[in-house]
Swiss-Prot record:
Disulfide bonds: none annotated. Its main location: nucleus. It comes from the Eukaryota. Component of the Mediator complex, a coactivator involved in the regulated transcription of nearly all RNA polymerase II-dependent genes. Mediator functions as a bridge to convey information from gene-specific regulatory proteins to the basal RNA polymerase II transcription machinery. Mediator is recruited to promoters by direct interactions with regulatory proteins and serves as a scaffold for the assembly of a functional preinitiation complex with RNA polymerase II and the general transcription factors. The keyword Iron-sulfur does not apply. It is found in: Nucleus. Belongs to the Mediator complex subunit 5 family. One of its GO terms (biological process) is regulation of transcription by RNA polymerase II. The gene is nut1. This is Mediator of RNA polymerase II transcription subunit 5. It comes from Emericella nidulans (strain FGSC A4 / ATCC 38163 / CBS 112.46 / NRRL 194 / M139) (Aspergillus nidulans). Component of the Mediator complex. GO terms for cellular component: mediator complex.
Length: 1054
């Protein structure tokens, strides 16, 4: 029979390792002698691997691809047969891991095929993209159907893994993930061909489109997190061709030139009511900016305000002043902490006046500032902001009695109003006068610091003052730090960093004027490129300086839960990133390099055997190397003590060396590891707890070290508290845990991440009706009621944006948005007169900044998309925010309008309002009505305003100066990053490039296969063990190195 002769032929070719060119010539001869159908030939090829007894033979996909390009077998036939014989159908028993299934599989009866499947599918993708195969409409239809079957099979396998107690599902199998990605790319490539577009666009192929839509609907949710670029491409494909897996009778949507006509007609029919700027709108927005890490970006704020108020600058000024006083008043009523009160107060007194002054500095932009302030002050709550004379007759809290005066003097200091107006605006004689020297100027402060470095310490102590000078101080200190980084003046830089680290509230105020990225990027670059051989003299001062700078970076990172982009770090090779992600994990001795083993031994000897830490010990080990060894040092030392090889007093005495100022920052890493060790260990925790007690509450510590030690405890206290409470629950009779918890208690309020307190969460979640979402709706209603009388000087309703943030983080943005839409619908139906106010409040909540996505907002605002390189990637954010949820709902409006017309209309109106508020900045030419009897046409460039604020609007962390750090590794690092970034190209271009590479030479001369777990070659060379390889990396590999497709396999499998 022909099949027997072909089977023997294929087996001999595999046995003798016949290359592609010779296989093509031999197979052409055999076709003349023994003709065979493409399905039978494909089956024969796939069954031939059973005879080899190995899981992966790289020649088999080469032979299949060769036959496809010869036209002897068709792609849809190959995909169908491949799926039929694939081990993706295997169902592991509950509790069995994927590796064991592969290991125990019997090759001749049940061969593991995923690596072969991956390579064949990738070859198919490349041949389709090059136009070599799948040329007819019928082939395209059959290929689409085969791809849909593959997707459904992979999803079914993933679900079976979950059902078999494999919580990782597909994530537990690198090969399955790569197969999942390959099938998705194949679908994307086919859909991008001319014939593919014809099939997806034509009405007669509706059954095929339904089949593809059902597969896509199952594929996209899993793809979203694993392969975002591929998800975006397929998601666009689904929307473009309406591939939702339903027949047109259910969708009832008219498509014309790929435009949803019904959707456009419906949106056009939705009429907007008058735009209302509720008093609650800015109240919500400012609360959201300041509730956790200060999310203040001048460009974003100014753009939001202009979008909200357009040319009405007098209204803008009055409303933001009123809202800032309202936020401060609300904080007092809610008994917010003193540090929160200081931040709100500083925003009003230190931030707003220079912000207004910068606006006025733009030519021809004028507004009656004194009148705006007067109107605003007439609307604030007099019980919270009493006059000086009223303060003595008040029985309540008069802590904010001087805020009005502070604000007015700050405005006068910035030349917004004359000093003589203060008495009239206050309604009484002020209790102070303007300082003789006027407001601080940033450049003058920089000059003072350069002349006398001790001046920096004095200025830092003034950051928390409320005299209107904080912005100039922050600008000067930040730029001086940048200059010191460039000059490598680390001694002075150390003193500034120490001063800032021990003043966490000053850091809050700094973020009103500079982003974390702007402050920290030069510091992180300095630490990452710190060369040990550059430093001369004693090593202890270098450790001291390095540790102080690092401690400030860690203080920012842990206080505000910053991510790498916020720190200004782009490379995964960064020491800072490695320390944060890996520093608290200890290593086994056999995992250490020879250098690390030597350093570890010398540090153990210095701490526990010698009489102190010698110069030789430190000079042999750079600070970066030491910090990465701390966890292992603790693991080995504590293990020796627990094994009885080291006395506890010796252990304690050795660790006390780490309480010296030059080593103290390393306790951040040490305490983190120690807390994890205590929490994870099932052994008796006595020795680890005694060690922790000695480090948290040392019996003696120097005055200089005490401040650093407090900063270390601030950083680590929250995680230690959670771990110790869990250990106490497991060991309720232990009495040695409470003293540690008591020592940590004063530090627990260090973090500022907008997380709610337990005392807040309980009433929200127990709210009747509706729990947390019900409590949000109740708050929403109180905001509407308050906004119905915007000119009355009444107390604002109790509000904290923590409520919304908590709901987003726990319930998800989609459910929160649904609750807001429910309330909007209720207000529209029950009280149409407040519908406009309700819409503005909802839009303000949706538009409000969120820390998780704020970096993305900054990137979008400051990034020049017209001139940017494709390599510049927007930072990812790990949460689905309200804007994302609203966009998703807006896409469903056509279908929703058939079921719930009013809700669909509300979504359209809310979507329009949010887009108006968040519209990107542009050159604007507003018509300014100054209530002065004339209209003035002004070309107001927002960039000019930002420049007048003396703030950097670039968003990349560099001030208005060249931040060339003059460090040896900069050029190399930039080259590496550029090489990496150049791989991030447009998906369409990648496909074209990959096709061009394939067209060069597909003759393959492969080495022997093996029984390894890696994944083949070609575009299938996804990297041995590289699970998260992106589409761009995979395909660009072929583009940059066509020989990548022809690599010899020898040595790749072990």
């Amino acid at each position: 029979m022909a099949s027997e002769q072909w089977r023997a032929f294929v087996q001999r070719c595999l046995l003798h390792r016949i290359d592609a060119a010779e296989f093509r010539d031999l197979s052409m001869l055999l076709f003349q002698r023994c003709p065979i159908g493409d399905l039978l030939l494909t089956e024969t090829l796939l069954q031939a691997r059973l005879a080899t007894g190995i899981k992966w033979d790289p020649l088999l996909p080469v032979y299949i691809d060769c036959l496809c390009r010869m036209g002897r077998v068709q792609i849809p036939t190959v995909l169908t047969a491949l799926l039929k014989h694939s081990s993706i159908h295997d169902k592991p028993s509950p509790g069995a891991d994927v590796a064991s299934v592969k290991k125990n599989a019997k090759p001749r009866a049940k061969c593991y095929t995923l690596m072969t499947d991956i390579r064949v599918i990738q070859d198919a993708m490349l041949s389709i993209n090059s136009g070599t195969t799948v040329k007819t409409l019928l082939e395209v239809i059959h290929t689409f159907c085969a791809i849909a079957d593959w997707i459904q099979a992979i999803i079914a396998w993933h679900n079976s893994q979950l059902d078999a107690d494999q919580p990782a599902g597909m994530m537990g199998s690198p090969d399955a993930m790569l197969l999942f990605e390959a099938v998705g790319i194949l679908l994307s490539v086919l859909a991008g061909t001319g014939k593919g577009i014809e099939v997806l666009s034509a009405g007669p192929h509706e059954a095929t489109k339904i089949r593809i839509g059902q597969a896509l609907s199952a594929y996209l949710p899993l793809c979203a997190d694993m392969y975002p670029p591929l998800h975006n491409r397929l998601d666009g494909l689904q929307k473009q061709f309406n591939l939702y897996g339903q027949p047109p009778s259910k969708l009832d949507v008219t498509m014309m030139d790929n435009v949803n006509v019904n959707a456009l007609q419906f949106e056009a029919s939705v009429m907007d009511g008058p735009t209302i700027h509720s008093r609650a709108g800015l109240y919500i927005y400012i609360n959201a900016m300041l509730v956790g890490r200060p999310l203040v970006d001048d460009s974003i704020l100014l753009n939001y305000l202009y979008n909200r108020y357009a040319e009405h600058y007098d209204v803008l000024i009055e409303e933001i002043i009123t809202a800032s006083f309202d936020v401060l008043s609300n904080a007092m009523y809610r008994n917010e902490s003193a540090r929160t009160m200081l931040l709100f107060r500083s925003f009003l007194v230190n931030k707003l006046p220079p912000f207004f002054a910068a606006m006025l500095a733009v030519p021809m932009v004028t507004f009656p500032m004194e009148e705006c302030i007067s109107h605003a002050l007439s609307r604030i709550d007099p019980n919270i902001f009493p006059s000086f004379s009223q303060m003595f007759s008040m029985q309540g809290n008069a802590a904010l009695s001087d805020v009005r005066q502070e604000f007015l003097f700050s405005c006068a200091s910035h030349k917004l109003i004359p000093e003589s107006s203060i008495e009239r605006l206050l309604g009484e004689n002020p209790m102070q006068t303007l300082p003789v020297g006027g407001s601080y100027m940033k450049d003058e402060l920089k000059a003072q610091i350069s002349a006398n470095h001790e001046r920096a310490e004095q200025l830092i102590s003034d950051i928390e003052s409320t005299e209107g000078n904080a912005g100039a101080i922050v600008g000067a200190i930040t730029e001086v730090m940048h200059d010191l980084c460039m000059q490598k003046e680390t001694m002075t830089l150390k003193n500034i960093c120490n001063s800032l680290s021990r003043r966490p509230q000053s850091l809050d105020v700094m973020l009103l004027f500079r982003s974390p990225r702007q402050i920290l990027q030069p510091l992180c670059a300095l630490l990452d490129s710190w060369h040990w051989d550059e430093d001369q003299g004693e090593s202890q001062p270098v450790y001291d300086e390095f540790g102080s700078i690092l401690l400030l970076v860690l203080t920012f990172k842990y206080r505000y839960d910053l991510r790498p982009w916020d720190l200004g770090i782009a490379s995964n090779d960064s020491f800072i990133i490695k320390l944060i992600e890996q520093g608290s994990s200890s290593q086994k001795l056999d995992e250490l390099t020879e250098k690390q083993n030597k350093n570890l031994g010398e540090w153990i000897a210095a701490l526990f055997i010698a009489e102190g830490i010698s110069e030789e010990t430190m000079s042999a080990c750079s600070p970066q190397e030491f910090y990465m060894l701390v966890s292992t040092l603790f693991s080995q030392s504590l293990g020796a003590c627990e094994a009885g090889k080291l006395e506890f007093d010796t252990l304690k005495g050795g660790f006390e060396y780490l309480l010296e100022p030059f080593l103290l920052p390393s306790l951040v890493v040490a305490l983190t590891w120690l807390g994890n060790h205590i929490w994870e260990s099932e052994a008796d925790p006595t020795i680890p707890l005694r060690t922790l007690q000695s480090l948290v509450s040392p019996s003696s510590i120097s005055g200089e070290a005490r401040e650093i030690h407090l900063t270390v405890l601030n950083i680590t206290s929250r995680s230690l508290e959670e771990q110790l409470k869990d250990v106490r629950a497991r060991h309720p009779t232990r009495t040695d845990i409470k003293p540690i918890l008591d020592a940590l208690d004063p530090c627990l309020s260090f973090q500022r991440t907008a997380s709610c307190h337990k005392s807040e969460l309980e009433p929200w979640t127990t709210h009747n009706p509706g729990g947390l979402l019900g409590s949000i709706r109740a708050t929403f209603q109180s905001l509407i009621l308050w906004s119905t009388s915007p000119d009355v000087s009444m107390a604002p309703p109790s509000y904290t944006h923590r409520q919304v943030i908590t709901a987003i983080r726990t319930l998800g943005a989609s459910r929160v948005l649904a609750a807001l839409l429910d309330e909007l619908k209720f207000q529209t139906e029950s009280n149409p007169g407040t519908a406009g106010i309700a819409l503005d409040i909802a839009a303000s909540i949706v538009s409000a900044p969120l820390s998780e996505s704020f970096a993305f907002d900054q990137f979008q605002t400051h990034h020049d998309h017209s001139t940017s390189k494709e390599s510049e990637q927007a930072p990812h954010y790990p949460i689905f925010n309200l804007r994302d949820a609203l966009n998703t709902q807006h896409e469903l409006v056509p279908k929703l309008s058939e079921k719930d017309l009013l809700r669909a209309e509300i979504i359209v109106r809310l979507y329009r309002r949010v887009n108006t508020l968040l519209a990107p900045p542009a050159q604007v030419a507003p018509n300014l009505d100054m209530n002065m009897g004339m209209n003035v046409n002004v070309n107001m460039n927002m960039n000019n305003i930002i420049g007048d604020m003396h703030l950097d609007s670039s968003g990349d962390g560099a001030s208005n100066q060249n931040m060339n750090m003059n460090m040896e590794t900069d050029t190399r690092t930039q080259a590496q990053e550029q090489g990496h970034n150049n791989e991030q190209a447009n998906l369409n271009q990648i496909m074209d490039n990959a096709a061009a590479a394939v067209g060069m030479d597909m003759d393959m001369n492969m080495g022997g296969g093996g029984d390894g777990m890696g994944v083949g070659v070609g575009v299938g060379e996804l990297g041995l063990g590289e699970v998260d390889q992106s589409i761009d990396d995979v395909l660009n590999a072929a583009e940059m190195n066509p020989e990548f497709l022809d690599l010899d396999m020898e040595g790749m499998f072990q």
